[in-house]
Amino acid sequence: MNILIAADSFKGSCSARQVTDTIERAAKNVIPDVTITKIPVADGGEGTVDALVAAMKGTKVSVPAHDPLGRPITAEYGLLPDGSAVIETAAASGLTLLKPEERDALHASTFGTGELIRHALEHRVKKIILGLGGSATTDGGAGLAGALGISFLDKDGKELEPGGVQQQSRLAAGHDGII
C-alpha cells in the first residue's frame, strides 16, 4: 500500500514537517509495510521555506535580523538550485516570534523581513519568492522597505519611526539610500 501525506502546519503547535512525520508514525503503527511519501506544504506562512527547499533540493541560509519588535534574532531563508531565494515574512516578522502578551500589530515592524531580502539581493539571487503569511505586523511593508533604504516622511519632512498602522500620517517617501 502507498500513502501520500501532504499536510500544512497546525498554527502555533506543529510545523508541516512535524505533522507529516507524526502521521507517518501513526500509519506505520497500523500498517507496518506501508510505503509513505511525505510532502510538507505551506500557504505562504510558516513552513513555506521548508516545503520549497525540501521539494526543490535547495539549501537554507541563516542571517542576523530583527524580530517584529526590533530585537536581534537569527532568521533563515531558502536558496533554490535555480538561484531563487524563498523568504517567509513569518521568519523575521511573524506572530510565532512573539509571546501572546507581546503581540501588538500597531507597533510591530517588517524590518527583519527586509533584512532577509537585502541579504539575498547582496548575494545576487536571481528571483525572490516572498511568502506573506503569518505576519505579526500591519505596517504595510514599510519596515521591509526601510531595510532596503527607503525612508518614510511625515508632512513636515521628518522621518517616521517604524511601526504599524498608527503611522497613517505618511505623506512622502524618500529613496536616496535604496539598494
Model-derived features: positions:
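Conserved active-site and cofactor/substrate-binding residues in soluble primary-metabolism enzymes
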Residues: C14, Q18, T22, D43-G47, ...
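Solvent-exposed, flexible loop/coil residues
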Residues: C14, A65, L69, Y77, ...
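Structural motif
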Residues: N2-L4, T59-S62, G83-I87, K126-I129, ...
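Glycine-rich nucleotide/cofactor/substrate-binding loop typically near the N-terminus or early
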Residues: R25-L97
